[in-house]
Amino acid sequence: MVTTHNLGFPRIGAQRELKFGLERYWKGESSRDALKALGAELRARHWNAQRDLDLAPIGDFSFYDQVLDMSFTLGNLPKRVQGFHGDVLDNYFRVARGRSAQVVDEHGACCGGVSAGEMTKWFDTNYHYIVPEFHADTNFSLDPSCLLQQLAEARALGVAGKPVILGPVTYLWLGKEKDDSDRLALLPKLLPVYGALLDTLTAQGVEWVQIDEPILVTELDAEWRQALRTAYAALETRRIKLLLATYFGTLGDNLTLAASLPVDGLHVDAINARDEVDALVRELPADRVLSVGAINGRNIWKTDLNATLDWLEPLAKQLGDRLWIAPSCSLLHVPVDLASEEKLDAEIRSWLAFALQKLDELKVLATALNQGRDKVADALAANAAAIDSRRRSPRVNNPAVKAALARIDAQLGNRASPYTQRAPKQSARLNLPAFPTTTIGSFPQTADIRHARSQFKAGALDEAGYRAAMQAEIERSVREQESLGLDVLVHGEAERNDMVEYFGEQLDGYAFSQFGWVQSYGSRCVKPPILFGDISRPKAMTVEWITYAQSLTNKPMKGMLTGPVTILNWSFVRDDQPRSVSCYQLALAIRDEVLDLEKAGVRVIQIDEAALREGLPLRRAQWGEYLKWAVEAFRITANGVQDDTQIHTHMCYSEFNDIIASIADMDADVITIETSRSDMELLDAFDSFRYPNEIGPGVYDIHSPNIPTQDHIVGLMKKAAERIPAERLWVNPDCGLKTRQWAEVIPALTNMVAAAKTLRNQVQ
């Protein structure tokens, strides 16, 4: 019999209950006990939804991040949060965001907050994790209380499950040394703690543990490969079965290593690594389980169940009970329930599967494999009809878009002149001081803004009323910026619910869910639009709002657009053509918007490519192809403008050292980047690469409520000036200010502007 299991379930709740519960707690509007009760309620609901599985995941729920959870389980807390009184949950939030609940920190020893842990992308996804911190003297100590609590809850519900933990080698790989030490040297100290954790679970009667080592789908040098051998040789002696889980890609040259590790089962991503399954069957010892991720855990399209059975059936016959099936990865990366989508176009809806529907697909596959296809004939027929409907739909294919794509030539992405000739023209037109100040784009999405938007969408507020409300918010943003003394202004994006969804709503080829939320980090959720067909722009999308904002001030007003690569990487993308083709379609559509903004007199246009790096394949050997079309798509979007129009781009959560040449090749006049959490370490890339254009290294972390001091900002910018000529430096926050409150934004920007004025006097 084939065994079914799941690697992880979305933790936020179908209606984002966790998000709202966290935010209530942080604001002091609810108690710690209420938050913990909400967590227990969500876990129970999610386990009940997975009752049909042979093994449900236990320990996949987190109040913020599963990597941070592992740091606490291993006793690896940064020294700056040690010694505070109160519940462990409050220290947990201090690491995550610099503060815990408002009421806790106001009466505790850290009312000024602490530095939040560094946050970066989880492999090539749009989820973010808190980076573990290591020192030469780091010690580990086991605290399994959270995992044991969840195990007890699951058992009380009668749930058959397996605890899920992050593997020791991936845990070290994901972290960062805070001194000159080598984090891999900590493995001998770490392994006994993992061994003790497995012993604890054994004592609880646990049979299987899922231990995640996704680094096996990356390029590993000899040291890291040996670390995996060492780790699992040490853990082999434990009296518990280990399912080693990999996901997000192919094993490649790590296949033999993965198959040889002394574990009891191996999970592989059969969406990306289907071609490796036969080799794994040959290489795995005859007593090992092979778990295949046959359902795409990262996208929302229905699985072609009949085609999947065509290749699973011979495998089941060959492996028998040794075959397990599951989604390719944790379902954290997809929304919870398609049944909530009552307003979604019925035809498009018929093509989709969210987390609960993916579990239904898994059940159909298992029934067909265990009892024959006849047992699920109706379900298979309905699935085949949906797959065929999508394949044949004229809504997916637009001949005019394909014709425009065919007309792209090598000149379309080139500026008329090089940066050295453009810069003086832009300087003359903009007349900016040294160390010019700006923000990244968005200002706080207040309750009034959200209320007006919801009223408008519900039909309770007419278009004129909505426009007036948004114009009032734009005017507020402009007046605040003028009062602060910022040099290049933004309109604040009051009218935008999301930097990707806003554009997708106005592009043909996109559809939108009501409740298709996925977690980005902590309480931050995003609702990726659904790119289902060929993309085109029926009309201008931003010109009216930007020109209104410009009419309110004599200072330069930035046009704000999201770039094609980011729109692509932050969407659920059609899987019936190469991603590059969809990206070029987006580039042509956004290019039209850029040119319309320029015609309207907009002097500075920002095209955000926050997600450029996260689209990189996990294996460096495949980077070249991706960067070629990604950079070309940006250039097509941006480079049709005149020399005196200044193009900005923004990138966040990016390590730039290894792609700095490609970033330079984008040829944006100004790039703004996230650097503050890394204390300007990201600028190390510029030690060996002379970046030719202007740059704004982010000087304060907008993801934390902490207010940066003027001296701190001056210090960061002086570090930047050691690497980049002062005349090419801008001063700006790390990212947009949408998620902050005005009460936090005003003092932070006040200090930022004051720091810029100090720098103009101190730095020549």
Curated annotation (Swiss-Prot):
Its cofactor is Zn(2+). Keywords: Amino-acid biosynthesis, Metal-binding, Methionine biosynthesis, Methyltransferase, Repeat, Transferase, Zinc. This is 5-methyltetrahydropteroyltriglutamate--homocysteine methyltransferase. Its EC number is 2.1.1.14. L-methionine binds at I440, G441, S442, E493, D608. Gene3D superfamilies: 3.20.20.210. It holds the Pfam family Meth_synt_1. Catalyzes the transfer of a methyl group from 5-methyltetrahydrofolate to homocysteine resulting in methionine formation. It is an enzyme of class 2 (transferase). The active site is at H703. Pathway: Amino-acid biosynthesis; L-methionine biosynthesis via de novo pathway; L-methionine from L-homocysteine (MetE route): step 1/1. It catalyses: 5-methyltetrahydropteroyltri-L-glutamate + L-homocysteine = tetrahydropteroyltri-L-glutamate + L-methionine. Belongs to the vitamin-B12 independent methionine synthase family. 5-methyltetrahydropteroyltri-L-glutamate binds at R16, E17, L18, K19, K121, R524, C525, W570, E614. It comes from Burkholderia ambifaria (strain ATCC BAA-244 / DSM 16087 / CCUG 44356 / LMG 19182 / AMMD) (Burkholderia cepacia (strain AMMD)). Zn(2+) binds at H650, C652, E674, C735. Binds 1 zinc ion per subunit. GO terms for biological process: methionine biosynthetic process; methylation. One of its GO terms (molecular function) is 5-methyltetrahydropteroyltriglutamate-homocysteine S-methyltransferase activity. L-homocysteine binds at I440, G441, S442, E493, D608. CDD domains: CIMS_C_terminal_like, CIMS_N_terminal_like.
